[in-house]
C-alpha cells in the first residue's frame, strides 16, 4: 500500500466525526486534500467549512461546499488537518505548506482537533525528521534568523515562498524539541515572529493514522 492510499484511508475515517448541519474546520496539505475530496460526498449534510488556506478554500468550492471565513463563526465542532510530524502526546510540527498561522487560528476555534496522517509522520521527538517552519514578518527576517541560531537552530530562508498573510518562512534545522510547549512559547515571543510550526499549546485530540492494515484511531 502506498503513501497516498494510507492518506486516503485516514481521511475517509475522519468523516465519522462530521456532524450533520455543522460548519467544520479544515487545514491544508496533501492529506487534507484527500479529506476535502471525501467530504464532497457529505456536501448536502453540512452547512460548510472554514479553511486554513486559500488552496483549501478553492478545493472546497470545487466540491460544492460553502466556504465561511473565520470571522463568521464563533466556534467549530471539529478541525481536521494533517501534520509534518506528530509525537505520542499528539503534539505536532506543521507548516510544510506555509499555512501554519491560519491553521493555528482555525484550530483554536475548534472543540476537537482531528489530525490525519500516514505512518511516516509519527515520531518520538519533534524536529527529528522535519525542519521547523517559522513565519516571519519580512523586515525581521535576518534579526529572527540570528535569534534562531542563538537558540541552537540552523535557519534557512524558504526562497520564493510568500504566505497567504504576505510573510516569509524560515525553516529551522537541527532543533530536537524536547519541550514543545516551552519552545512554542519562546519562539512566539521573538519580535517579528508571527507564529512557529509547533502545535503543542493546542495539540490534537484524536489522531487517525492510515496504515497498511487500515485506519487506526488514537484518542
UniProtKB/Swiss-Prot annotation:
Single Gene Ontology BP annotation: D-ribose metabolic process
Keywords, sorted A to Z: Isomerase
Pathway: Carbohydrate degradation; pentose phosphate pathway; D-ribose 5-phosphate from D-ribulose 5-phosphate (non-oxidative stage): step 1/1
Entry annotated with the keyword Isomerase: yes
Catalytic residues of the enzyme: 103
Complex formation: Homodimer.
Role according to the record: Catalyzes the reversible conversion of ribose-5-phosphate to ribulose 5-phosphate.
Name the UniProt record assigns to this protein: Ribose-5-phosphate isomerase A
Organism from which the protein derives: Pasteurella multocida (strain Pm70)
UniProt lineage: Bacteria, Pseudomonadati, Pseudomonadota, Gammaproteobacteria, Pasteurellales
